[in-house]
């Protein structure tokens, strides 16, 4: 949502409620260590050189520190865990005057706290939380009008494909073009003065194909189009698409943000006030905002997001290397492998390869056996939780895409998608090694 002043600089209390114990203050899009002395904020640093604290540059805290120490400065009781405002309404100041909060469909303090934090870590001015990733995507599609065109990555999440082709494209007369966005020339050939939205996933789901976000941003903007990035595979820990030229970034909060597969949610972030206002209006009018309780679950989960992402990625790298060397694996996609075609480009626009891997065996019976017989990989859809997951996208997350379209983009029946968790990596590798060693039953 468009954030009140108290949320734009969430570590800085208002002059009325300043607390001398407050240690962090946001400055622009970075952070400075600060201390509040008698409600007067001054930059300070502990040094051994005698340099004046007023002139000593202070290092910014890491993302892990920010996520753990983030708190709601509006809370009069200074709770270490953000309170859940589980209420439908708030009492008015008078018969003719609302307070800052009056109806939770429009605004809620618990959700505001999460939105403020997500805006901060996405390097955005505005952030909005929705009841699911799909409702977040719906808010973006509301920016497109009949007669407009959408250019989208061809290797796209099945739910997104179904939505923009069957619900938006067919009903509203919007032309949807599925393009190999790893090929900049193909992107250019499909752009026109009717293109309103360019829709990317990088890496894509499930084949983890990498697109040049910086270059595509320039192409989109040359045609006056909006560049939208579904960043769910990466999380704000590993990628900040707004810094690369994107206009809107989306996350499925269900995944890395909440982190425990315990709630459904989505988020949108942008630096464009006009786009932000339109998305916020959609959020309020349709009643699709994230509930106070689910906002709280995300706030609790996000505290460990940086650590979880780091551990999951470490495990995924080792598992990808194991799979790449296994004779029964015919093809593997993971941008952390030097052999991956998107390796260098991905490294230039992200902080790591993430924890999602896809691979092929050339045999549906073998792939089916791997999915069904692993011990520590839950046979389920989604990704980004603490536990490892495994599925066949053809039959699950991408089942709504026509078979011909799946085959066209290389998504075959035997493709296995892994979401690597935080378990002991030796256990995970041994688990995969065991199922790969068993002869499949035809």
From Swiss-Prot:
Transmembrane domains' residue ranges: none
InterPro entries (UniProt xref): Cys/Met-Metab_PyrdxlP-dep_enz (IPR000277), PyrdxlP-dep_Trfase (IPR015424), PyrdxlP-dep_Trfase_major (IPR015421), PyrdxlP-dep_Trfase_small (IPR015422)
Protein name, per record: Mimosinase, chloroplastic
Residues engaged in binding pyridoxal 5'-phosphate: 103, 105, 133-134, 252, 254
Temperature dependence per UniProt: Optimum temperature is 50 degrees Celsius.
Outcome reported for the amino acid change (mutating residue 102 to F): Reduces catalytic efficiency 6-fold for mimosine, but has no effect on cystathionine catalytic efficiency
GO biological process: one example: methionine biosynthetic process
Noted pH dependence of activity: Optimum pH is 8.5-9.0.
Keywords: Amino-acid biosynthesis, Chloroplast, Lyase, Methionine biosynthesis, Plastid, Pyridoxal phosphate, Transit peptide
Cell compartment(s), UniProt: Plastid, Chloroplast
GO cellular component: chloroplast
Modification N6-(pyridoxal phosphate)lysine, positions: 255
Any one GO molecular function term: pyridoxal phosphate binding
EC number of this enzyme: 4.3.3.8, 4.4.1.13
Annotated phenotype, changing residue 98 to N: Reduces catalytic efficiency 6-fold and 4-fold for mimosine and cystathionine, respectively
Outcome, altering residue 102 to E: Reduces catalytic efficiency 10-fold for both mimosine and cystathionine
Transit peptide boundaries: 1-35
Subunit composition and interactions: Forms homodimers. May form homotetramers from two homodimers.
Cofactor: pyridoxal 5'-phosphate
Reaction(s) catalysed (UniProt annotation): L-mimosine + H2O = 3-hydroxy-4H-pyrid-4-one + pyruvate + NH4(+); L,L-cystathionine + H2O = L-homocysteine + pyruvate + NH4(+); an S-substituted L-cysteine + H2O = a thiol + pyruvate + NH4(+)
């Amino acid at each position: 949502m468009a954030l009140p002043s108290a949320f734009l600089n969430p570590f800085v209390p208002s002059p009325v409620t300043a607390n001398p114990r407050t240690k962090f203050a946001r400055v622009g899009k970075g952070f400075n260590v600060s201390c509040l002395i008698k409600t007067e904020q001054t930059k300070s640093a502990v040094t051994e050189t005698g340099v004046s604290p007023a002139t000593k540059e202070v290092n910014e805290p890491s993302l892990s520190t920010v996520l753990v120490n983030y708190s709601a400065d509006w809370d009069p009781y200074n709770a270490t865990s953000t309170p859940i405002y589980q209420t439908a309404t708030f009492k008015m100041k008078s018969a003719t005057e609302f307070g800052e909060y009056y109806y939770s469909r429009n605004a809620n303090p618990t959700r505001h706290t999460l939105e403020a934090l997500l805006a901060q870590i996405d390097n955005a001015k505005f952030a909005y939380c929705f009841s699911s990733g799909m409702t977040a995507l719906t808010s973006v599609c509301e920016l497109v009008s009949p007669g407009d065109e959408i250019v989208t990555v061809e290797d796209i999440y099945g739910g997104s494909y179904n939505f923009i082709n069957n619900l938006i494209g067919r009903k509203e007369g919007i032309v949807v073009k599925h393009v190999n966005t790893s090929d900049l020339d193909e992107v250019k050939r499909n752009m026109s003065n009717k293109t309103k939205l360019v829709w990317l996933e990088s890496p894509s789901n499930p084949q983890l194909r990498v697109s040049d976000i910086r270059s595509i941003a320039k192409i989109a903007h040359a045609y006056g189009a909006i560049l939208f990035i579904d960043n769910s595979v990466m999380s704000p820990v590993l990628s900040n698409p707004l810094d690369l030229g994107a206009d809107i970034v989306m996350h499925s909060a269900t995944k890395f943000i909440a982190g425990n597969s315990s709630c459904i949610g989505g988020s949108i972030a942008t630096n464009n006030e006009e786009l932000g206002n339109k998305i916020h209006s959609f959020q309020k009018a349709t009643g699709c905002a994230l509930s106070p309780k689910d906002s709280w679950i995300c706030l609790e989960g996000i505290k460990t997001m940086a650590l979880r992402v780091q551990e999951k990625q470490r495990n995924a790298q080792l598992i990808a290397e194991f799979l790449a060397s296994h004779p029964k694996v015919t093809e593997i996609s993971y941008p952390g492998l030097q052999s991956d075609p998107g390796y260098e480009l991905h490294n230039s626009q992200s902080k790591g390869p993430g924890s999602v891997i896809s691979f092929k065996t050339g045999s549906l019976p073998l792939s089916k056996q791997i999915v069904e017989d692993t011990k520590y990989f839950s046979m389920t859809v989604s990704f980004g939780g603490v536990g490892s997951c495994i599925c066949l996208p053809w039959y699950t997350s991408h089942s709504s895409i026509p078979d011909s379209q799946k085959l066209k983009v290389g998504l075959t029946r035997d493709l296995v998608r892994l979401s690597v968790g935080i378990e002991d990596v030796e256990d995970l590798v041994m688990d995969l090694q065991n199922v790969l060693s068993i002869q499949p039953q035809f």
